[in-house]
């Protein structure tokens, strides 16, 4: 069951489109894109979340990421 969000789908899609646009404009390979996005997530957690909550947030994020990855053969 998907979780509801306090953010509108339009807001999320607009930000996603902008981020993808930056990566595409720079012709960023997949491995570098993942590295940069991972560093961004780490930075957000380390600078915006209290130390006591960081591990829990990171675990929740990792779980959500794993749950959203498709396992079909297409790429």
From Swiss-Prot:
Gene3D superfamilies: YejL-like (1.10.3390.10). Belongs to the UPF0352 family. It comes from the Bacteria. It holds the Pfam family DUF1414. This is UPF0352 protein plu2871.
